[in-house]
């Protein structure tokens, strides 16, 4: 039987308390920490997940308020969406409503600028 197998057999017979003492003794003897590699390995993975969540490729433009210049906002909404007068008026009257969904950031910012210029309030999500 090899030395490695002998150590494994001894470890199998130890209690949890004895194993804990063994780990502490090994850490002191060799100047290492059993917890360090796990923490170091987990940190970059968590950071990568957070970065992936933060990146967004599709945006929704939500009209939150028509402001005082409702007619101008209706005109801009019609231009952007291609809706008829009645549908655009309903969309503007019943805020908050999505004007356009699943669009690029650039397009969302252009639409936001147009609606705000007309007097409305917009939120990009």
Swiss-Prot record:
GO terms for cellular component: cytosolic large ribosomal subunit. GO terms for molecular function: mRNA binding; structural constituent of ribosome. Pfam families: Ribosomal_L12, Ribosomal_L12_N. Keywords: Ribonucleoprotein, Ribosomal protein. One of its GO terms (biological process) is translation. Gene3D superfamilies: 3.30.1390.10, Single helix bin. CDD domains: Ribosomal_L7_L12. Signal peptide: none annotated. InterPro entries: Ribosomal_bL12, Ribosomal_bL12_C, Ribosomal_bL12_C/ClpS-like, Ribosomal_bL12_oligo, Ribosomal_bL12_oligo_N_sf. It comes from the Bacteria. Forms part of the ribosomal stalk which helps the ribosome interact with GTP-bound translation factors. Is thus essential for accurate translation. Homodimer. Part of the ribosomal stalk of the 50S ribosomal subunit. Forms a multimeric L10(L12)X complex, where L10 forms an elongated spine to which 2 to 4 L12 dimers bind in a sequential fashion. Binds GTP-bound translation factors. Belongs to the bacterial ribosomal protein bL12 family. This is Large ribosomal subunit protein bL12. It comes from Syntrophomonas wolfei subsp. wolfei (strain DSM 2245B / Goettingen). The gene is rplL.
């Amino acid at each position: 039987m090899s030395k490695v197998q002998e150590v494994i057999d001894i470890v199998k017979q130890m209690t949890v308390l004895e194993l804990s003492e063994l780990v502490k003794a090994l850490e002191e003897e060799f100047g290492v920490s059993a917890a360090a590699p796990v923490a170091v390995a987990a940190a970059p993975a968590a950071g990568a997940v957070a970065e992936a969540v933060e990146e967004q490729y599709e945006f929704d433009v939500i009209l939150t308020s028509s402001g005082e210049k409702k007619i101008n906002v209706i005109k801009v909404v019609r231009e952007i969406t291609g809706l008829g007068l009645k549908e655009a008026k309903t969309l503007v009257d019943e805020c908050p409503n999505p004007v356009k969904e699943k669009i690029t950031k650039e397009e969302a910012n252009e639409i936001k600028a147009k609606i705000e210029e007309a007097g409305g309030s917009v939120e990009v999500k």
